[in-house]
Amino acid sequence: MKDTEKYLIHANIAADGVVERSDVVGAVFGQTEGLLGDELDLRDLQESSRVGRIDVAVESENGQSFGEVTVASSLDKVETAILAAALETIDRIGPCHASVEVTSIEDVRAAKRREVVERAKELVAGGFEETSLASDDILDEVREAARVEGIVDYEGLPAGPRVGDSDAVIVVEGRADVLTLLECGIKNAVAVEGTNVPDAVADLTADRTVTAFLDGDRGGELILRELAQVGDVDYVAFAPPGESVEDLDRNTVFEALRGKVPYSSLADEPNLREAATDDSGSAPIDNEGRGRSGEMSEPSESETESERASDGGDDGDAGVVAGGARSATDRGLVDAVEDTPAPAATDAGEVDEVGEDREGDMESDSDTADINDAEFDDRAADDPNLDEAADAESVEETDAPLDNEPRSIEEHVQEIVDAGSDRARLLGDDRGVLAEIDAVDAFDAIEDAETAPHTVVVDGLIDQRLLDVAAQRGVSELLGREVGEFVKRPVGTRVLTVGDLRTGS
């Protein structure tokens, strides 16, 4: 009946005496029987489930009984009203006089509608899940999924997708550090997952260029010492003191990696973190021509005089190169951090050849000078002013730098690029000329150079192929007329156009 009831008849009863529930039910059936005819007989209606169970609640007090009767009906509105009126004809309950008064006829469907409305209000207020995402939330969610999908399993350790085939790897502490580097575009990181360095990582360091990038705390130092004992470490970089790699932003990550130092210079230090921080401060090229190792070759007397003559120009050029190179590197996409140290030895045979060539040139120049001097003596007798002009000319010739003497980057750029020479020049740490070749042969020259150049100036396009071989040989700077599109851009090699150099952009 619960499923089909439409109305509920509520009636109050009062009896002059003590009565029970069974007395009330008997009075309802007995005194309404035959009153409304066969179609509305209460017993027949109940048997056909058109009228539900009669609920009675009665209490007795001071010799009188009071209560409430509830009858469920699935009849229509008119028939239900007739049935309710029939209940009021009851005047006796058991042996006692009684009265029945219908107080209300409740529409069950209306009650259900009220419940539906109230529940709907509750659902609207808090029943719905947040389905509308802001644009930033969507981007963050997709980026997070991309970062997680980028992690691969290398011998049971979390790693970037390039660890297996890259010739350089970055060793970090945990999975979160690998995620941070992936977010920065660095895909060749592998995690040791604790201070106990796994054998897989130790084996990996045997034939790769390894950079340990660790937290700036005691734990990072312990991992470095353990890694150095079981494997080979080439470079070391630490997060800022008290910070973890996983908490660093993109700029701080690249700043820390640029400041990496060779582990061989730290191996005997009692505090590796402080030593690494001190050494990284002198890593960039300064205005005096020092290399990345911070050492400076002893200049000859003639070189010293030449540098004094062009000190102002050199300082400005070095500052432009440093600032421009940093911004150019920041704009690039980093696929993997690869920085192979340059060989330090200089081939003696190459120096001898250069010396012989220069000696031959000097002899021919000397012969020409003797002839010119004889001609000049004849003219000088007629024109005394020629003496002063000759003195000035000799001063200019003395001040002009030799081809392999150190000079500013700007001078090399003017001689190679501005002159439209279609040539390339390989420069050493002191900006002296190591070799000069056709621009199309720059790749082979860098690859085959006995001494890896510090800087290469090219009158032409710097493409991915040239950048790759420069990074492999440890070239610090590449300067060209224009720069092509790069798929990956190693951190250790700065790439600038002549325009970038002069604008400082």
From Swiss-Prot:
Region (Disordered): 268-410
InterPro entries: DnaG_primase (IPR050219), Primase_DnaG_arc (IPR020607), TOPRIM_DnaG/twinkle (IPR034154), TOPRIM_dom (IPR006171)
Binding site for Mg(2+) 1: 173, 215
Keywords, in A-Z order: DNA replication, DNA-directed RNA polymerase, Magnesium, Metal-binding, Nucleotidyltransferase, Primosome, Transcription, Transferase
Sequence ranges of Acidic residues compositional bias: 349-376, 384-402
Complex and partners: Forms a ternary complex with MCM helicase and DNA.
UniProt cross-references to PANTHER family, sorted A to Z: DNA PRIMASE (PTHR30313:SF2)
Name this protein carries in UniProt: DNA primase DnaG
Encoding gene (name): dnaG
